[in-house]
Amino acid sequence: MHELGTRQRPLSSSSSSSSSSNMTDVSAAAGGATAPAETAATSSSASKPLTNGANKTSTAMAAPTTTPTTAATAAGAAEAGAIASVAGISNQVKLEHHHRQSNNNRPVAPYPPVPAAKPKPTPTPTAESKFKSTSREVDVALRPTPARSSTISPGVSIHTQTIQQESSSAKPGMSSSSSSAQQDVDEVARLFEEKPEAFEKWLTERAPPEALSRLQEFIESRKPLKRPSVTSDLFQQWMSASPTVQQKSPRSLSNSSASSTLPECRRHLMDLDEGELFMELIRDVANELDIDVLCHKILVNVGLLTHADRGSLFLAKGTPHNKYLVAKLFDVTQKTALKDAVTRASAEEIIIPFGIGIAGMVAQTKQMINIKEAYKDARFNCEIDLKTGYKTNAILCMPICNYEGDIIGVAQIINKTNGCMEFDEHDVEIFRRYLTFCGIGIQNAQLFEMSVQEYRRNQILLNLARSIFEEQNNLECLVTKIMTEARELLNCERCSVFLVDLDCCEASHLEKIIEKPNQPEQRPTRAIMPGDSFDEKKMRNRFTVLFELGGEYQAASVSRPSKTELSTSTLAQIAQFVATTGQTVNICDVHEWVRDHNQIRAESEIDSTQAILCMPIVNAQKIVIGVAQLINKANGVPFTESDASIFEAFAIFCGLGIHNTQMYENACKLMAKQKVALECLSYHATASQDQTEKLTQDAIAEAESYNLYSFTFTDFELVDDDTCRAVLRMFLQCNLVSQFQIPYDVLCRWVLSVRKNYRPVKYHNWRHALNVAQTMFAMLKTGKMERFMTDLEILGLLVACLCHDLDHRGTNNAFQTKTESPLAILYTTSTMEHHHFDQCVMILNSEGNNIFQPRTTRTFLLLARRFLRFDLLPFRAFTRALRPLVRPLLELDVLELPDPSRIFLLTVYLRLVTRTIFLPPPEDEEEEDEVEDSVVLVVASVVVVVAVAASVVLKAELDVEALSPEDYRSVMKTVESAILSTDLAMYFKKRNAFLELVENGEFDWQGEEKKDLLCGMMMTACDVSAIAKPWEVQHKVAKLVADEFFDQGDLEKLQLNTQPVAMMDRERKDELPKMQVGFIDVICLPLYRVLCDTFPWITPLYEGTLENRRNWQDLAEKVEMGLTWIDHDTIDKPVEEFAGCADEEIKDIEFTVTTLNCNQQAQHGAGAGGDDSHTPEHQRSGSRLSMKKTGALGKAVRSKLSKTLYNSMDGSKPKTSLKLLESHVSEDMDDKSPTSPSQPPHAGGSVGRMSASSSTSSAGTVVDKSKKRSKLCSLL
């Protein structure tokens, strides 16, 4: 029955007809002891739904046959009978329940509603049988039924509701009462509450599918905050894969089943008055979201309201400048089924432009048109009548507007069916009022349809995004999938993708990929006008691959079109136009567009082409890498702006997919090239065998001969080979070779390889690594810090010191970041340090360089070499039999043997091969045949088993002292942490934590975090240990560091066009002493001071740094006064020579430049200076008088002094130069005298000592120091 006929409303308590109807229902349920009129009313109510119209009809029919008195009597009797029957039923329920409880094992017969014959005994039902027999009642109980109001007592109302539920849900053959059914349900429910596992078992094993579905519906209906929305069940149904026509709303599913029953379902609506019918029809379309179902309901309901014969509904489509009407449903009558109407409209789509025809005029003017005689109106088109044979008399056409007043459709009804020849004003008013509500419903349905389309689009785009990662190694599959999705979503006939040949497929494109892409620019989508043109010279043969996808059942094709095919194909020329201009083209008429563009030749392939949508495909750099093309929509209409928007998303994903695939191919190529480069690098980075053998055979001197235990070690006197021998001595002296069973040749090869991988830069070279490693060795041995370290940690620290600057390029991390070098891209933090560690790992992984390899493998290699020397295989037949047994073990690894076993068997196999090749052939072939095959096989098998067992046993014995995997990971972790700690940024991060531990008196450094902090501080102390070397070593090393920094500054000026910092600016080289003092105060002295406080055995590092600070401070002050220039190759002569003096005058003078107040030094003597020399420089008072501060050495004097010194280099006039110097200094010294001559002299560290005559010094000539100083002062 139709939904409108089954809709029930709450009955009014004041309605007499409603009370009468309820009473008759109760009487019928009680047994029928009522008057015939009541029985008739009961039967009428049972056969017809309880609607207002039905109640009115039944009352009207009963009125002529009864008088008022009779009716009142009948009503009273009915009410009394109802009360009595209810009381009887209540007692019957109590008795039956008591009987079931008192005798639960005997058969129980249901009590009839009225006295009847003796009931037939039945067996006692179990809980499971009750649930099976009452599954329909359970279903009724699970369904939420709204309560109905009534004027009767609550018990009667509930019973009435139960009877209505039973009468509406039970089949005609059911004989069980509602009370007994309810009791069965309650009993089964109690059983399931007591034993929920039984209920779960029944649901999983024996529940029928329909019961599970109803239960699921009930659970879903009980969810809180359930309201109709885009996330409702209807929306979920719509989003399924079924076609839209099959997605009916729940209220319309029963309506479209059979067209013959449709008039019967709606016949009861004729009994409603006009107002109720109008509201009922509005409710019918209010919540409908299926646009097809909604339009069908609108036409059917309008025909019912206006008594029209048939109707049509048109929806507005197109752009604001090109609107037209599309017939959604056409000629729908009261008997037309939904499926037939939709099928007929889809088969022949009717398009009416605005302003054409009756519907077009209504859409354009927004005014209603009521035609009384259609054939007399010039706007009427009678062609449809001629085709169908139907005669149109009256037409009423009215616009459908949204809430803003815009036209969204037009509704048209034809011919009246109630005998009238035309539509009157009443019909027009009803039509207008109803379409007002229909406009709201149509717009909601369209919005819902758009949301569904958007959801489908998003799902497709998500699938495409997923496909980009799934098909990144197969471009053909990826493009085919994208084209298939685009063709199905946009409903077009063909789809093509043209790919452009770019250099992005080459590995050299990697630098372009690394660059950050700019923001993508928006490209407007517009239709190509006839006046648009382009330069024919810009069209080039750029397409190399063409993907084509035809109809639904056609497979995709991939081809490489030739130049001739591209030049003769119209579609290809249009694609070239898009690739050249970078614009999206939407061609409505291809033939007209080709005629307007003379450069493009029209071919026969466009005869069947009507519309084309063509769009460029760009990559991240906004470079056109292809063109996507859609051809002909399935319904023959042009591509809309919405189609272009959707297609743009496909083009973007296509570009992403193509770009990603190309980058994946490039990455594969680069990885292959990287493997080749690493192989070549590993070969060239490894030391040669000749060098390794030579170093292996060299004698290694003792550590004392290399001065390895001293903190004053210098490498200036060592040749390159001696540096390698010194490294080997450190490993031997720490007992690392014997402790970890490191093969001596492997260690030699590794040392030579490490030296080979250092670049010949000025400071961060192999000798710097040697000095760092020697300082670590001295700290461990002389500084007694090895007692805080394990042997494994000592090994890791020495390896880290030697490898901490591998492949250093002479530039720091900041320079790598500024220039955006590949290293800076590869490592974001501690760039060079990570690279040094990677180089260290690369060398260790090179063949023959892994000093951390397990001992068992090396042992079995030695066993293999020894095995080859013995002659264990006397028979040729034996070798032939044993060889096929050993070879599968080596190739297939059937026994899953460990590495030593495989090596041992490989040795056996090699021995068999060599014996087979080099053994002379037997003199007597028959003697060889005498050996039985079975004996040979048995002996060969025994040899294999023994070899495997022996290798396993030997491995178990030798693994005791091997470097286990845990030890290997531990030593590699130590090496990595130590190398990264040489980054001063890491030092500053760890320094505060280390200082806190030292200040708290920490003495246990065995924890993992504390040990890591200690190792990091030790690595930094070793890395900057050149600052603690003797002054004659330190100032040379400082000059090397400065030169390397100056080279980086030159690169910054040249490449980056920026001004470098002071320490890297060659023009500010005179500030080097001052910068050295700052470096010592900020980094070196605090580090060495805290280390000395904790480990007093390394005090020489602190003292040497303090001494060098005094020297740098003095030199910095002399630079400020102009007495020296930092422009030599090395700073071994910080003060200029007095080349103008005669040799005989300075023959025995040892120039000692300490301070400029030489007279005070002469007065106080060496004792005062010696006492003060032990006081740290930065702790002394600033009482020392400087000629710079007093102005004793003016600018003019310094200029003349400079000229005198440099002009006297040739020694032509030494005496004159000396006198000139003396006169200038004396004049200036007389003008400015010291303010406090009694102050103690400043004991800054001596900058250097220069002997004027080495022969005199060697002869042992004794010179008075005070006399020397006096002579020097007299010269000044």
UniProtKB/Swiss-Prot annotation:
Manner of cofactor binding, per the entry note: Binds 2 divalent metal cations per subunit. Site 1 may preferentially bind zinc ions, while site 2 has a preference for magnesium and/or manganese ions.
Biased composition annotated in UniProt, kind: Basic and acidic residues: 129-140, 1171-1180, 1221-1233
Bias (Polar residues): 147-166
Basic residues bias (residue ranges): 1266-1276
Gene Ontology MF terms: 3',5'-cyclic-GMP phosphodiesterase activity; metal ion binding
Main subcellular location of this protein, as a coarse class: membrane
Top-level EC class: hydrolase
EC number: 3.1.4.35
Keyword Transferase: no
Function: Has a role regulating cGMP transport in Malpighian tubule principal cells.
Designated name of the protein: cGMP-specific 3',5'-cyclic phosphodiesterase
Natural source organism: Drosophila persimilis
Annotated gene: Pde6
